[in-house]
């Protein structure tokens, strides 16, 4: 079970790569909950991801 979680986490981090490339960034702690819509990620109810700084 733990291995599956780690695999999901690592693939999510790859998908939501860095703001340095000019894309949308996502906080690590909510990247698994992000759904992509245009350039706004909505992460669960508490986190919101936006353009990288």
From Swiss-Prot:
Location of the protein in the cell: Secreted; Nematocyst
Cleavable signal peptide: 1-22
Job description of the protein: In vivo, only causes a weak change in behavior in shrimps (C.multidentata) (slight twitching of the walking legs), but no lethal effect is observed. No activity is observed when injected into fly larvae (M.domestica).
Tryptophan amide PTM sites in chain numbering: 51
Protein name stated in the entry: Toxin CjTL7
Post-translational modification: Contains 4 disulfide bonds.
Molecular-function annotations in GO: toxin activity
Tagged with keyword Amino-acid biosynthesis: no
Cellular compartments per GO CC: extracellular region; nematocyst
TM region positions: none
Superkingdom as given in the UniProt entry: Eukaryota
UniProtKB keywords: Amidation, Disulfide bond, Nematocyst, Neurotoxin, Secreted, Signal, Toxin
Keyword DNA-binding on entry: no
């Amino acid at each position: 079970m733990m291995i599956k979680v780690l695999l999901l986490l690592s693939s999510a981090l790859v998908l939501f790569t860095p703001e340095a490339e000019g894309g949308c960034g996502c906080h690590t702690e909510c990247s698994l909950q992000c759904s992509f819509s245009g350039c706004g990620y909505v992460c669960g109810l508490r986190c919101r991801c936006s353009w990288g700084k």
